[in-house]
Design a protein with these regions (language model features):
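Serine-dependent protease modules
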Residues: 1-235, 249-268, 275-280, 286-302
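Conserved catalytic motifs of ABC-family nucleotide-binding domains
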Residues: 240
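Conserved "HGTGT" condensation-loop signature of ketosynthase/thiolase-family condensing enzymes
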Residues: 243
Length: 302
């Protein structure tokens, strides 16, 4: 018997576009995790049309940061700026590949810091975004947010929009967080998450919340509970304390607290200023890892 081979339907390839930032002359590139997640192949195209196949060094879904590597040398790269020094009203530029319009640059100002959006639903999510009005659209994700000196202050990650296109508000992972994540992925293969060992009150402190909790403090981090034998407990932090500063930097909100803590490794000692009974008290806290000790965690740790 003779016949025809059955018709087959090829599964169409899906392609996505995004942006990235070269951060070393030997080819390390930062982008967003959501840009490369579940990709089978990643191609990096430079402004001069040179193409490289990239490999994934590591990812951190909690911050939506991914680190790629291409085999090249002598590449131009961006220097990091200290994102803690960014000021409200400061002029910034967003650089990227929106709608595949290569090397598009838009301008705006910093309109807020330590913004939390709730777009990452994971329990370990870390959102402490820089907010800007520089136009960011699909394809910009993973691209650079730079200051007037051309230094990297953030990785463009998200927009707030009812349509999916720019409507005035865009958000970037601060460079201090991205830099620490990248360093950890390069050195350890995983992100070293430092924990203080407290439960925070679910809402920001306001006069109404403060009255409910029985505290006079209307800003800061209210310590709802302290984990036994955790870093905070060992340092003398108590339930009902209000954290006001970390290493001298004022803390008003949960994203500010998370953003500062994200800069440190387990085993680091930080100075924490708490308000207790109307008085300020400075305590030295030795941060722990997610397993409750001060060791750095190997990526194969189980």
């Amino acid at each position: 018997f003779y016949g025809y081979a059955p018709r087959t339907r090829e599964t169409p390839q899906r392609m996505g576009i995004g942006s990235g930032v070269i951060v070393s002359e030997d080819g390390y590139i930062i982008t967003n995790n959501h840009v490369i997640d579940k990709s089978d192949k990643i191609t990096v195209t430079l402004d001069n049309k040179t193409e490289y196949e990239a490999k994934v060094i590591g990812t951190d879904p909690s911050t939506d940061i991914a680190l790629l590597k291409v085999e090249a040398n002598g590449l131009p790269y961006l220097e990091y700026a200290n994102s803690d020094d960014v000021e409200l009203g400061e002029w910034v530029l967003a650089v990227g590949n929106p709608y595949n319009l290569t090397s598009t640059v838009t301008a705006g100002i910093i309109s807020a810091k330590a913004r939390e959006l709730g777009i990452n639903r994971s329990q370990m999510s870390l959102e402490s975004f820089l907010q800007t009005d520089a136009a960011v659209n699909p394809g910009n994700s993973g691209g650079a947010l730079v200051n007037a000196k051309g230094e990297l202050i953030g990785i463009n990650t998200a927009i707030e929009s009812p349509t999916g296109s720019y409507s005035g508000y865009s958000f970037a992972v601060p460079s201090n967080i991205a830099r620490k994540v990248v360093g950890d992925l390069k050195e350890f293969g995983t992100v070293q998450r430092a924990m203080m060992g407290i439960s925070m009150w679910r809402d920001e402190l306001t006069p109404a919340v403060a009255k409910e909790l029985g505290t006079d403090e209307v800003s800061g981090i209210y310590v709802y509970d302290v984990i036994p034998n955790g870093a905070a407990a060992k340092a003398g932090i108590k339930k009902g304390d209000v954290i006001k500063r970390i290493n001298g930097i004022e803390i008003k909100t949960r994203p500010e607290f998370q953003g500062q803590l994200a800069k440190y490794h387990p085993g680091a000692t930080i100075s924490v200023t708490v308000s207790r009974g109307g008085k300020l008290k400075d305590l030295d806290v030795v941060l722990q890892n997610t397993y409750g000790d001060v060791a750095l965690v190997d990526k194969n740790y189980t």
